[in-house]
Amino acid sequence: MKLDGKVMPFMNPRHLVEHGLSHIPEDRQKHGLVMSYSIADNEVLCTYYQPPFARGIQRMFPAIVENARSLIKRFDVRTPGEQVPAGNLSGGNQQKVIVARELSRPVRLLVANQPTRGLDVGSIEYIHQQIVVARDAGSAVLLISAELDEILSLSDRIAVMYHGQIVAIMEASQADRSELGLLMAGSKKA
């Protein structure tokens, strides 16, 4: 894998995060959150060991709580408080917690895998806005989606895969919705 033109050797997740990789997983409940943890704890899953959230081996709870309150407000997470378990939130608010966490630190590459699957229209629009903000701030975005409208509205370039192989790469401005659908279904080769 290369990031900013530099070869990145195999790294554990902590090293990837420290090198600017952020990830919005396809399955938010299985891979994105610890459902029994509070929103505050979920917001620092990737950075709990770093200042201002820790000093040595001691966690700095006031900083963790303040971070959560700030992200709840900034990302419009609908919750009675930062100590609510993530499992008590709606799907849209769970996704906002993940997006807040992943975009609250410097991001060089955002991998967004099915970022809006199963969400309401308002949450979809909000997640799309945050992806665009990250892109406009200079982050590279790898969007993985089966939603044609999402792909066409957020992408600069589109690579279509079928059975694990890239079958076409095109500029989004040149993409045709029906052609993309055929390529995704394996009915047409570029």
Predicted feature residues:
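Glycine-rich phosphate-binding loops of nucleotide-dependent enzymes
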Residues: M1-A190
